[in-house]
Amino acid sequence: LIFPHHENEIAQSRSAFGHALMAKYWMHNGFLNISGEKMSKSLGNFFTVHELLDQFPGEVIRLLLLSAHYRQPLDFTHDGLIQAKATLDRWYGVLRGRDVAPSASVPQAVEDALSDDLNTPLAIGAIHQLGDPAALRAGANALGLLQQDAEAWFRWTPAGASGPTEAEIEAAIAARQAARKAKDFEESDRIRDELKAKGVVLEDGPKGTTWKRG
């Protein structure tokens, strides 16, 4: 990079947003590519963060961005977003139904990875190896992940998506539970299958029935 690239970046940002301190650290990351091509308005492959947030939770976008080292280019794809969502679904699944607070300290393997020139891909790999829910939450929290309640995570809905409301889903679950209590398993299965066809998956467990959109 040579002058005047990034000239007056702090002055511009402070004037635009009215904050005395925009950031403590400044880094220049690798190119952001979209399906193998550099993102640009001229190529028509440009989209905004707000547009992405209509389709995916913010943590999905964050995880995909962290999946590449900041010095390296990142190929940002829809498949990558789907994979990041699946990863977070697995992690939140570990926390679901449990009152899990993060452990007091960041797991050593995660801390070591971040101390190695912010090696976020290595840190993500270390998080995958954590079996203890409290350690999992602490390690993910260090990357700004697993910040939500697990139930809220699984009930997130994309903007403009069709499907039953939470109240309608809860009413259907109550009707299904009544059918099961009456040993009307045909009706119970019908309600479950109807919800599944509408994009709602039921999961029966020791503490009752939970649901998620998927």
Residue ranges and their predicted role:
Residues Y25-N29, L64-L65, H78, A101-S103, ...:
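Short coil/turn segments at secondary-structure boundaries
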Residues L1-D99:
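Alpha-helical recognition segments enriched in aromatics with Gly/Pro capping
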Residues H78-L81, L114-D117, G160-P164, A178-A179:
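Short, contiguous acidic/charged loop-to-helix segments that flank catalytic cores in large enzymes
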Residues I124-G214:
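Basic, alpha-helical terminal appendages of large translation-related enzymes
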Residues M39-S40, A101-S105, G163-A167:
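Short helix-capping and inter-helix turn/linker motifs at the boundaries of alpha-helical repeat units
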Residues P73-L74, G80-Q147:
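Helix-loop elements that line ligand-binding/catalytic pockets
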Residues E9-Q12, T48, A109, A113, ...:
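Short, hydrophobic/aromatic alpha-helical segments in well-folded domains
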Residues E59-L63, S105, A167, A171:
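Generic alpha-helical secondary structure signal
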